[in-house]
Amino acid sequence: MKVLFVTTEMDDFVRVGGLAAVSAALPRALRPWSDVRIMLPGYRDVVEQFTHIEIVGQCAALAEMPACTLGRASTKDGLPVYVLLCPELYDRPGNPYGDESGRDWPDNDIRFGRFASAAAELAAGTLDKNWAADLVHANDWQAALTPAYLAWRQLRIPSILTIHNLAYQGLFPKDSLRRIGAPDSSFHIDGLEFYDKLSFLKGGLVYASHLTTVSATYAKEITTAELGCGLEGLLRVRSAAHQLTGILNGIDESWDPRHCAQLAQPFGAGDWKGKQANADYVRRQFGLAVSRGPIFGLVARLVHQKGVDLVLSAADEIIRDGGQIVVTGSGEPAIEDALVAAHRRVLDRGLAAAGHDDLSAVPDDFVGGRQHEVDALLMHEPRD
């Protein structure tokens, strides 16, 4: 089976949240049974990391979406990656979705409408004349319109949409419908319309052949009024039709601390000297005082939904009792500012921010204040 895995993040190239980890691990896990290929936007960080990108096709302009070029490359271990090359949309500073101050790019409808439209063309075999997909696997709102473009063009290619986080829906003004070349008939309650706005995610929920999410628990939670983010009615319909499945994320063995070259000292279960050596290294790297107390890790996108504010409210008590906290990630400017202020307040005694460094092997425990299950990755990362 030929599978096109459509994503806007992938570890080793560009990362904002857990989507990047899934996008790096799942296609590799599928390789023994399928010809799986990844499609990514041509962000600056992505393009710079490939030594060679072969041009395979051209996308014509559509509505307000510019023409673009499709390139093909491969990872170091031979996984094929298609890159959508359009510098005016993707060659920008900041992160994939916003500028350096954390504000969303105002043309994100164009940026990800262009991406989804091109993915549908690639799946149909009109961009790479030597390859077409038997199945399209789109991820989150940024790629969610891929099944919609397939349907609008009457392309009978089965599609899956995975919901990694229902709270992020890709909402835009109604006028975006025209900007991305979507048919007027799609703007209604059984289409892309969501409280008089256009919802990219809803488009995928409506048009994808099947929906999946990160666990069986989360699949149930998003059909409730409390956690359905206004989409619970549609999700209940898809669930009743057996078209919504929760699949628990599995363990990525590349995180095994016994064989990880990135650690200061590899270690396994019961090897507390090795564990301590890595903890001491992290303390030195981030200016924390030497201690034999526990390190608590917070590995998350720094947004309210992840409970970062609750961790901050407990930080003084944790530090007073001898613990230390290491935070990794980026996110809302207000929360980042609060972390900086907390760090200045306690100086080296117990709180450090570490950007996007992977520190899952170091903490003695993890903290977070999520009130519902939306992170099914961290709990499975092997750390001994």
Question: Each PLM stretch: what is its role?
Answer:
Residues M1-G355:
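Catalytic cores of nucleotide-sugar-dependent glycosyltransferases that transfer UDP/GDP/TDP-activated
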Residues L347, V362-P363:
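A short, highly charged, low-complexity intrinsically disordered segment
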Residues G350-A352, Q371, D384:
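Generic low-complexity, intrinsically disordered segments
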Residues D357-L359, D365-F366, H372-A376, E381-P382:
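Alpha-helix boundary/capping motif
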